[in-house]
A protein has these predicted regions:
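Short helix- or helix-capping micro-motifs
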Residues: 45, 151-159, 183, 204, ...
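Start-transfer (signal-anchor) and selected internal transmembrane alpha helices
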Residues: 1-53, 140, 241-249, 341-344, ...
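Hydrophobic, aromatic-rich transmembrane alpha-helices
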Residues: 226, 248-251, 302-340, 348, ...
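Membrane-interface transmembrane helices that cradle and orient dolichyl/undecaprenyl
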Residues: 15, 19, 140-146, 178-199, ...
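Membrane-lumen/periplasm interface segments of specific transmembrane helices
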Residues: 240-279, 305-310, 355, 359-360, ...
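Transmembrane-helix motifs of polytopic, lipid-linked glycan transferases
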Residues: 122-143, 180, 320, 324
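Membrane-proximal lumenal/periplasmic loop motifs of glycosylation machinery
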Residues: 54-67, 80-103, 112, 118, ...
Length: 594
C-alpha cells in the first residue's frame, strides 16, 4: 500500500534515522517495498507491451520513419557479419544525421532476439524498463520512496511513452538516457561525487547519441549543472573539476561521431528545424502570436492526454496556492538551501529550456518533447507531495494514480470502452485527446485512408502484405536492372502513405542484405507540374525505374498521376511490369529505354 505522507527529505529525518534503529529498519523495509512495487510496475507494463507487439505488430506493415531506422539496424548487423567489428564501426561511424545508439544496440541484440523486424521491436521495452527505473531513481532525489513509486507509475503511463515503446524509434532511448543523466547529476551531491558526475557525463553522451535533436537540450543540462555549482560555494574547485571531467567525458564519447558527421547533422538540424526543410513539418507563426507560443503546448498535451495534463496543472496550482499562503504572499526569490530545492530548480530549468528550444522551431517533429516529459511529471508529483494539507494531497495523488492506471489500460489493447478515441476541442489549441487506445502504426494506417477496425483488434490482414509487395518490387527491379546491365535507380511517382520509399529500402536490406536508395517525386517546392517532375527524374540522379500507380485512398492526392506519366513518357519511360497491391490497386514499373 502506498502511503501519501509528506514527501520531502529533511535533516530532521536523518537525525531520527541515526537515533532510532527501529525507525531506520522500518524505513529500509519500506524502501525495499518501494523498489519491489516499481519492479512490479515494470514487469506488468513490459508484459503488456510485448503482448501488444505480438498482437498488433508481428508481421504487419511498418511505420514510415521506423522503416528507415530498421534498415539501419539490419545493415549494422550485416556489416558486422560480413566485415567484423571494423565493418560495423565503419558503417556506424559514416552514417550521419541520425543517432547511432539504437540501431547499434539492436544489431548487437539480434543473436538473442533474431534478425528481423519483430526482433528489433523487442529492444524498445528494455529502454522502457530503464526509463521507469530511472524515473523512480530521479524522483527519490526529491521526494520520499512512496511518492517516487507514484512518479514511476505516472511516467510509465504517459501515453506517448507507451506509443514509442511499441515503435522502432529514437524517442524512447533518448528519453531513458536523458532521465538517467538527470538522476546521476542530482545523485552527484552538487557535483562533489566524482563517480556520479562522470556517470552523468556518460549518460549525457548517450542521450546525444540516441537522437541528434537532443543537442537542443544541452543548454538545459548546462543550466542544471550550473545550479548545482552556484547554490553554495563550498568545495567549488572540486565541484568545478568534477564538472569539467563529466563534460570532457561527454565530448570524448559523443564527440568523434558528431565531428565526423558534423555537416550532415548541421544540415539536418538547421535545415529541418529552421530552414526550407521545416516547411513541410509545421506551420509558420509570428513570434508575437498565440500560435507561436502555444504550438509546443498543444504537442505536449497530445503526448500527455488532457486528463493527465489537467491533473498536473491542478497539482502545480494547488501547491502554488499553499506556498503563497504559507509565505503570506509571493515568496521572495532566494538561493535554494537544500538539496531538494536545488534538484527541483534544476528540473524546472531543464523543462523550461526544452520547451523554449522546441518553441523556436516550426518543426513539430515526432516525440521531440518526450525526453523532458518525465521530468515534468516528476515535478508534478513533487508539487503534490509538498501540499501540507492531507485531504488535497491524498485526493490529487489518488487521481494521478487512477489516471495512470486508466491510461495504461486504455493502451493495453484489451479494454475497448477506455480505448475509444475521445477528443475535445480546446479554444486556441484545437482537438486534444481524452482517451485514444490506438498505436502509432494504427494512426498511420488510418491516415493512409484505410479502415483499421476496432481499436482493440489487430489491423486487417491485408496490412500483412505490404512488405511482401515491397520485397517483390525490389526483387523484380533488381533482376531487371541486372539483365540490362544497369545500376538500379528507383523512384516512386505516387503519393502513398503506406507504400512508401522507406518500406522498399527496408525490404532490400531485410530480404536481400543490400542497401537500395529509393527516392520519391515531390510536389514541392516547384509544384505538381510536368516540368518539375521531369527535372526530378534527371537530377540529382538519372532515374531508370519509376513506380506509378492508382491514387491512394486518401482524398485529394498532391501528386497527379497523368502529370507524372506525361513527364515519364517525355523522357522515354514505358510501363513494363505491373503489381497488384494488397488493397486491389495496381502499380506499374516504368523503365527508361536507353
Amino acid at each position: 500500500m502506498v502511503r501519501f505522507g509528506m514527501g520531502s527529505r529533511s535533516e530532521a529525518d536523518d537525525v531520527t534515522l541515526a537515533r532510532s534503529p527501529r525507525v531506520a529498519s522500518r524505513r529500509l523495509a519500506w524502501a525495499r517495498t518501494a523498489v519491489a512495487l516499481v519492479a512490479g510496475i515494470v514487469v506488468v507494463t513490459v508484459v503488456l507491451h510485448v503482448v501488444w507487439l505480438v498482437r498488433f505488430r508481428h508481421g504487419y506493415v511498418t511505420e514510415w520513419d521506423e522503416s528507415g531506422y530498421l534498415q539501419f539496424s539490419l545493415s549494422n548487423f550485416d556489416a558486422l557479419h560480413d566485415g567484423g567489428p571494423w565493418g560495423l564501426a565503419k558503417i556506424v561511424g559514416n552514417r550521419g544525421t541520425f543517432g547511432p545508439l539504437l540501431p547499434l544496440l539492436t544489431a548487437l541484440a539480434y543473436p538473442f532476439t533474431g534478425r528481423g523486424i519483430f526482433g528489433s521491436l523487442l529492444v524498445l521495452p528494455l529502454f522502457f524498463a530503464g526509463l521507469v527505473a530511472a524515473s523512480f531513481a530521479l524522483a527519490r532525489q526529491l521526494v520520499s520512496d512512496s511518492w517516487a513509486v507514484v512518479a514511476a507509475l505516472a511516467v510509465a503511463a504517459i501515453p506517448a511513452v507507451t506509443d514509442y515503446a511499441r515503435l522502432f524509434h529514437f524517442a524512447l532511448p533518448a528519453t531513458a538516457c536523458m532521465t538517467a543523466a538527470l538522476w546521476a547529476l542530482l545523485r552527484s551531491d552538487g557535483l562533489r561525487r566524482v563517480g556520479w558526475a562522470v556517470f552523468s557525463g556518460l549518460l549525457v553522451a548517450l542521450t546525444l547519441l540516441a537522437r541528434t535533436m537532443t543537442v537542443a537540450y544541452i543548454p538545459g543540462f548546462a543550466l542544471a549543472a550550473g545550479v548545482l555549482l552556484l547554490v553554495e560555494t563550498s568545495e567549488l574547485r572540486l565541484r568545478m573539476r568534477n564538472l569539467a571531467i563529466a563534460a570532457g567525458l561527454t565530448g570524448l564519447v559523443a564527440g568523434p561521431w558528431y565531428l565526423h558527421n558534423a555537416r550532415s547533422i548541421y544540415d539536418s538540424l538547421v535545415g529541418s528545424g529552421y530552414g526550407e526543410g521545416a516547411v513541410v513539418f509545421g506551420r509558420h507563426h509570428p513570434v508575437a502570436s498565440w500560435g507561436y507560443w502555444a504550438k509546443e503546448l498543444r504537442l505536449d498535451l497530445l503526448a500527455l492526454w488532457l486528463p493527465l495534463a489537467g491533473c498536473l496543472l491542478v497539482s502545480f496550482s494547488v501547491a502554488f496556492v499553499y506556498l503563497v499562503a504559507r509565505h503570506k504572499g509571493l515568496p521572495r526569490p532566494s538561493r535554494p538551501r537544500s538539496a531538494r530545492s536545488v534538484g527541483l530548480l534544476a528540473l524546472v530549468l531543464v523543462v523550461l529550456e526544452g520547451y523554449l528550444a522546441l518553441t523556436s522551431s516550426r518543426n513539430e517533429g515526432t516525440g521531440f518533447a518526450l525526453p523532458w516529459l518525465p521530468a515534468l511529471v516528476i515535478l508534478g508529483v513533487a508539487a503534490i507531495a509538498s501540499i501540507p494539507a492531507r485531504a488535497p494531497r491524498v485526493a490529487l495523488a489518488s487521481v494521478l494514480v487512477a489516471l495512470s492506471v486508466g491510461a495504461v489500460t486504455a493502451k493495453s489493447g484489451w479494454v475497448e470502452p477506455l480505448a475509444k478515441v475521445r477528443r475535445v476541442s480546446v479554444p486556441g489549441l484545437g482537438l486534444l485527446p481524452v482517451t485514444d487506445g490506438r498505436g502509432i502504426i494504427q494512426v498511420e494506417v488510418a491516415g493512409g485512408g484505410y479502415d483499421i477496425g476496432p481499436v482493440t483488434h489487430p489491423l486487417p490482414a491485408l496490412h500483412r502484405r505490404w512488405l511482401p509487395l515491397a520485397r517483390d518490387v525490389v526483387a523484380w527491379s533488381t533482376h531487371h536492372a541486372e539483365q540490362r546491365g544497369e545500376q538500379l535507380h528507383l523512384t516512386l511517382g505516387l503519393n502513398d502513405l503506406i507504400f512508401g520509399n522507406s518500406r522498399l529500402i527496408l525490404a532490400a536490406q531485410l530480404w536481400f542484405h543490400q542497401y537500395l536508395l529509393v527516392d520519391y517525386l515531390r510536389p514541392y517546392p516547384d509544384g505538381d507540374t510536368v516540368a518539375a517532375y521531369r527535372r526530378e527524374l534527371v537530377s540529382p540522379r538519372r532515374v531508370n525505374a519509376l513506380v506509378i500507380g492508382d491514387p491512394s485512398p486518401v482524398p485529394n492526392p498532391n501528386i497527379t498521376r497523368r502529370k507524372v506519366e506525361a513527364a515519364a513518357r517525355s523522357l522515354g519511360f514505358t510501363p513494363v511490369k505491373s503489381f497488384v497491391m494488397p488493397d486491389g490497386r495496381t502499380i506499374w514499373i516504368w523503365w527508361r529505354e536507353a
